[in-house]
Design a protein with these regions (language model features):
Chain B
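Exposed aromatic-hydrophobic patches
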Residues: 58, 102-107
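Noncatalytic modules at the cell exterior or secretory-pathway interfaces
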Residues: 65-67, 105-125
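Short, surface-exposed beta-strand/strand-loop-strand elements in extracellular ectodomains
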Residues: 77-93
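Transition segment at domain starts
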Residues: 22-60
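Activation corresponds to long, low-complexity, non-globular regions
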Residues: 19-32, 142-150
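Edge beta-strands of jelly-roll/beta-sandwich modules across compartments, strongly enriched
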Residues: 121-141
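Sec-dependent bacterial lipoprotein signal peptides
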Residues: 1-19
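Short proline/glycine-enriched turn/loop motifs at strand-loop junctions of beta-rich domains
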Residues: 74-79, 122-123
Length: 489, 150
């Protein structure tokens, strides 16, 4: 997670737990059973032979190229036609003339508001990605579909000049959100289920991933009873829901006129094992964290959405999984009264998961970060259309250390830095440094309390205008519930 | 053997297409520029903009200290910038020409205001109206009032 005023401790609360925890999914998928057979392999999930003789037509899905193409086209035609019909939108009245202009005239950075560019566009890209992913293609073969979908929309789907920020956000954000939504919807589905449970699962999966929901209905998969493909289930899965209070202030001690109180609700899903799955297929391990907050001003209720998925990993030394060189793909969306930051990026570096025979397990990582596109709230750039942020590339890195007492609690500290030279917006540079410390304690494995203390410093240099430095702080106090119970074994 | 020639021809065609309309134009009769100025509003329209780079200014008497700008422009390529100065020359508004948007100026000194339009490689249509606003009107400049363009 590259940036802050988020909940990195919460985000990492389970980061190291996967090496400690085995979570039974037997109630979800009867054919998968995890067991800890010996101390040496206690953390390794084991797959028993399926106890179901049901066929598994979705275990080896066929590719449907032309269906995917048709869906990609529909994902462009439908929003265009909707805008054209319902609001007579001029930007939707594409023609040979507009296509010619878009192919020959310069691209322009657009001025949409933050949420539109940093959330809506990546979400649309996720649908492009899933046009391929849910038609039988794997991660790598689906990734170009986000790019092609975004490029064709920019060139042919609207009259506006193609925007480089849209192409980057839609393509990269679409891949990250798309694979995350594909896997979360897989987790929701259970092909063996019947009746109300089946309807609830299919509807939920369809809401999470509408392209997949459509395909399942059209192909009859939504009601076909069969085996759930084993790769729809991660080796471990962990979720948590936190609710509580947080206070921001543009001061070091949470006081002053800028102090702001919020009630927040956040959720996190940790999918797969960072120790054992990082080197497997892309996103076999990922984390997603989202938060809603009250009193969030013009930023809206969605104040945070962070996704980090493993792309590749290489063991360092002989011990499998304990020391790895890992590469992640990241999506960042933070929007609150103190800071707005959105980015698509990659981070990589060494990751250690140390499990001493006594005492807490230790997770340490030191990752460099490169963000092809990063958006950050500007002090001077403001357009009538609503854009109040600068665009640039993001470069930086950070480190974190986490101590985990199995079944009891976690304590961690994180520091992140990012440098953003402005490419579009008010000329200058931005630098942000964040640190946070925090911990949480659980009782009876399921219910817990937590606290985090976050500091943010930013140095914003503007050419020809007064520079702006910030020194902000945030405190979070919350109740937490873990699903399944934290530390279960 | 034909590949280099085909490549060269392709580059030539692409260059020709890319430069086909690089001519910088000023506003002309084809743009049917109209300014309708009255006591209760000013309306502006210039259409069929094709790579127009130009600067135009005119005056308008505003009896109130502020004004509302009703944006109805559609400039998919290039830019149009609207700068409004009050009776003593202070800038009370400086904004891009937008598509379906309402904004309000800062307060200024009533009297003869100047309106300046700056076009930069603009394609499409420039269209807006200005309406006087009394000082006590509730400001509307907030992101809630802004409409995303797509």
């Amino acid at each position: 997670m590259p940036l802050v005023l988020v909940s990195p401790v919460a985000a990492q609360a389970q980061r190291a737990t996967d090496s400690l925890v085995t979570i039974g999914l037997t109630t979800e998928a009867p054919h998968l059973r995890f067991s800890a057979s010996s101390p040496a392999t206690a953390a390794m999930p084991h797959f028993d032979e399926p106890d179901s003789l049901l066929p598994c037509p979705q275990c080896y899905p066929k590719t449907h190229f032309w269906v995917a193409v048709a869906e990609l086209v529909a994902l462009q035609v439908i929003p265009n036609a909707f805008s054209r019909i319902t609001s007579d939108a001029e930007w939707a009245k594409v023609s040979l003339n507009s296509w010619g202009n878009n192919l020959t005239l310069p691209w322009q950075w657009d001025n949409n508001n933050f949420k539109n560019n940093q959330f809506s566009h990546p979400y649309h890209g996720a649908m492009y990605f899933n046009a391929a992913r849910t038609n039988g293609y794997n991660f790598w073969k689906s990734a170009p579909w986000s790019f092609v979908g975004s490029l064709t929309w920019e060139l042919f789907g609207e009259v506006w000049a193609p925007a480089p920020n849209d192409l980057l956000n839609t393509t990269l954000g679409g891949i990250t959100l798309g694979e995350m939504l594909y896997r979360v919807s897989s987790l929701t589905l259970k092909n063996e289920s019947h009746g109300f449970e089946r309807v609830a699962r299919e509807v939920t999966a369809g809401l999470l991933n509408p392209v997949r929901g459509f395909n399942r209905v059209v192909r009859g998969e939504a009601w076909e009873v069969s085996r759930t493909p084993p790769d729809w289930r991660p080796s471990t899965v962990f979720g948590s829901v936190d609710a509580g209070y947080r206070r921001f202030s543009e001061s070091s001690n949470l006081s002053g006129a800028s102090a702001l109180d919020q009630v927040f609700l956040s959720a996190e899903l940790r999918y797969g094992s960072e120790t054992f799955d990082l080197g497997k297929r892309p996103f076999s391990f990922f984390q997603v964290q989202g938060a809603l907050a009250s009193n969030n001003g013009n930023a809206g209720r969605l104040t945070e959405l962070m996704v980090r998925g493993g792309l590749a990993a290489k063991p360092l030394g002989g011990d499998s999984g304990q020391r790895q060189l890992a590469l992640f793909m990241t999506y960042s969306y933070i929007n609150n009264p103190v800071i707005a930051f959105g980015a698509q990026g990659f981070s990589g570096g060494p990751v250690w998961n140390i499990q001493p025979s006594h005492g807490p397990s230790i997770h340490v990582e030191a990752l460099g970060t490169a963000m092809p596109i990063a958006a950050i709230r500007s002090d001077y750039y403001l357009t009538a259309e609503g854009r109040d942020y600068d665009y640039g590339i993001g470069l930086g890195g950070g480190g974190s250390a986490l101590l985990v007492w199995k079944g009891t609690g976690v304590f961690g500290a994180t520091a992140r830095y990012v440098f953003v030279p402005v490419i579009s917006g008010f000329p200058g540079t931005h630098q942000i440094l964040t640190t946070n410390v925090g911990g949480r304690v659980y009782w009876k494995g399921r219910l817990g309390i937590g606290a985090e203390w976050v500091r943010l410093w930013s140095w914003n240099i503007y050419y020809g205008r007064t520079n702006v430095n910030r020194n902000a702080s945030e405190l979070r106090l919350y109740l937490s519930t873990a699903v399944p119970r934290w530390g279960a074994s | 053997m034909m590949r280099p020639r085909a490549l060269a021809l392709g580059i030539l065609v692409a260059t020709a297409v890319g430069c086909a309309d690089s001519v910088i134009r000023e506003l002309g009769p084809g743009n049917a520029e109209t300014v309708v100025s009255g006591a209760d509003s000013l309306t502006y329209l210039a259409s069929n903009l094709e790579n127009v780079s130009d600067r135009v200014s005119f005056e308008w008497t505003n009896s109130e200290p502020r004004l509302q700008v009703n944006h109805q422009s559609f400039i998919p390529h290039g830019y149009g910038l609207l700068v409004i100065r009050d009776a003593v020359g202070a800038v009370v508004d400086s904004t891009l020409l937008e598509y379906q948007l309402e904004t309000e100026s800062r307060a200024g000194v009533p009297g003869v205001w100047s309106v300046t339009l700056i076009y930069a490689a603009a394609w499409g249509r420039a269209q807006f109206s200005l309406v006087p606003l009394p000082a006590d009107a509730v400001p509307e400049v907030s992101t809630d009032k802004r409409r995303a363009r797509r």
